[in-house]
C-alpha cells in the first residue's frame, strides 16, 4: 500500500507540472512521464526492486522539478497561483497561526464567502510566560470550495466587510495581517459599487492607527488594492501582482471583439511585458520582501513553507512596531541582528501609544507617496516641483 500511495503522489506531481506548463512540450516533462510509465510497466517486479526503483524515480522528480522551476515564465507563474492545488488562506490559518476563529458579516455587511475574516493568535514566550498576541487576519479565500467562493473575486460588500473589521482591529489596537489571493474584484456596480468601495478602503487604510502587514500571492488589479495598502508588503516568490491580468492586457492589445479569442503567444508576451513577478515588483519597489516557496510553488503539504511564512509575518510585524515605538538603541541593534530563522527569539509587545500611532500613519503616507513619485511622471516645471517638495 505504501508503494501505491507514493506512485499516486508522483502521478499527481506530474499532472500538476503539466497543468502549470499549459500543455507545452518539454524534454524534462517528457522524461518524467516516460520514467513513470516504465515503473508502471514493472508492476510484477519483486518488492525490494520496486522500492529501489521508486526511490530513484522520486529523486529524479525532485531534480527535474528544480530544473523546471528555473525555466518558469511569467505566465507559468500565473497558472501556478490559479491552480486549485495552490495554498489558500485557510491553509495558512491552519498552519501559520496557533489558533483562530472565523468571523462573519453583520448588519448591512452581508456575508461574502470570498472574503475571509478571522481573529487569530500568535503564541510567543517571554521568559516563563506564554503570551497569545491577537491579530486580525483578512484575505480572499479562493480554495476549499472554489465555486462557492467565486474564485476569490470579492463583491463590493465583501470589501466593505473587510474594511469594517479593519476598523474593529483599530479600535482594539491589534495588528492586521492581510492575504491577497484574488484575480480581481467582481465587476458589479450594485451599491456600494466595486470601484467606489475599493477607493473607500484605500482612503481608510491610509489612516489606520495599527500596523498592517500584507502577503501577496495573486494580486489582480483593484481587488488586490482593496486590502493591500500596508506598512510592509511581502510577496510569495511564485506569485504575481499586476494592474491587469495577462489575458485582459492581451485582449486590449489585440483589440478583439466579442466572441473572439486571443492567441496564447500574445498572452505570454503580455505577461512578460507587464513585469508581474515577485522579482519584478521587488525591483520596482512595489513590495518590500520576497518569501521563498518550494520548487514550482507552495502547496498544502509543504509544512516547512508555512513555518517560514510564520517567521516572515512575525518579523515584519515586529519591525513595524519597533520602527515607530520609542526604544533604546541597544534593543534596536539586537532586533536588527536577530538570526533570520529566529524571528520569535525576542519578544516584542504589539502595542502603540498615541505618539507612535501618529508616526506610523506618517511613515505609511511617506511610503506610498514615494511609490507614487516613481510611478508618475511629473510634467510640472522644476521650480514648481521644488516648491512642492519644500512644502511637504
Label the predicted regions.
Residues 118-207, 211-223:
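Cleft-lining beta-strand/loop regions that shape enzyme active-site pockets
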Residues 166, 273-280, 368-377:
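A short, hydrophobic secondary-structure junction motif
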Amino acid at each position: 500500500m505504501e508503494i501505491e500511495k507514493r506512485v499516486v503522489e508522483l502521478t499527481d506531481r506530474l499532472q500538476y507540472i503539466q497543468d502549470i506548463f499549459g500543455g507545452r512540450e518539454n524534454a524534462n516533462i517528457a522524461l518524467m512521464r516516460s520514467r513513470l510509465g516504465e515503473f508502471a510497466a514493472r508492476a510484477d517486479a519483486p518488492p525490494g526492486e520496486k522500492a529501489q526503483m521508486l526511490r530513484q524515480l522520486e529523486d529524479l522528480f525532485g531534480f527535474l522539478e528544480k530544473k523546471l522551476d528555473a525555466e518558469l515564465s511569467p505566465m507559468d507563474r500565473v497558472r501556478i497561483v490559479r491552480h486549485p492545488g495552490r495554498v489558500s488562506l485557510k491553509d495558512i490559518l491552519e498552519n501559520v497561526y496557533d489558533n483562530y476563529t472565523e468571523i462573519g458579516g453583520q448588519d448591512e455587511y452581508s456575508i461574502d464567502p470570498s472574503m475571509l475574516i478571522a481573529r487569530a493568535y500568535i503564541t510567543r514566550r517571554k521568559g516563563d510566560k506564554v503570551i497569545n498576541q491577537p491579530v486580525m487576519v483578512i484575505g480572499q479565500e479562493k480554495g476549499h470550495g472554489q465555486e462557492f467562493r467565486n474564485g476569490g473575486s470579492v463583491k463590493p460588500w465583501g470589501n466593505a466587510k473587510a474594511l469594517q473589521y479593519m476598523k474593529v482591529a483599530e479600535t482594539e489596537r491589534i495588528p492586521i495581517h492581510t492575504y491577497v489571493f484574488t484575480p480581481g474584484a467582481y465587476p458589479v456596480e450594485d451599491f456600494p459599487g466595486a470601484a467606489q468601495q475599493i477607493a473607500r478602503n484605500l482612503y481608510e487604510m491610509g489612516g489606520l492607527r495599527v500596523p498592517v502587514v500584507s502577503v501577496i500571492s495573486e494580486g489582480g488589479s483593484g481587488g488586490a488594492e482593496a486590502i493591500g495598502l500596508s506598512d510592509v508588503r511581502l510577496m510569495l516568490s511564485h506569485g504575481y501582482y499586476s494592474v491587469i491580468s495577462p489575458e485582459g492586457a492581451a485582449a486590449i492589445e489585440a483589440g478583439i471583439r466579442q466572441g473572439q479569442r486571443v492567441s496564447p503567444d500574445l498572452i505570454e508576451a503580455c505577461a512578460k511585458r507587464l513585469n508581474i513577478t515577485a522579482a519584478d515588483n521587488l525591483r520596482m519597489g512595489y513590495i518590500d520582501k520576497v518569501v521563498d516557496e518550494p520548487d514550482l510553488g507552495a502547496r498544502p503539504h509543504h509544512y516547512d513553507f508555512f513555518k517560514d511564512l510564520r517567521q516572515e509575518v512575525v518579523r515584519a510585524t515586529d519591525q513595524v512596531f519597533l520602527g515607530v515605538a520609542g526604544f533604546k538603541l541597544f534593543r534596536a541593534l539586537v532586533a536588527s541582528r536577530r538570526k533570520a530563522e529566529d524571528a520569535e527569539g525576542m519578544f516584542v509587545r504589539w502595542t502603540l501609544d498615541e505618539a507612535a500611532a501618529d508616526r506610523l500613519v506618517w511613515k505609511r503616507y511617506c511610503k506610498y507617496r514615494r511609490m507614487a513619485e516613481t510611478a508618475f511622471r511629473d510634467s510640472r516645471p522644476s521650480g514648481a516641483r521644488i516648491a512642492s517638495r519644500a512644502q511637504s
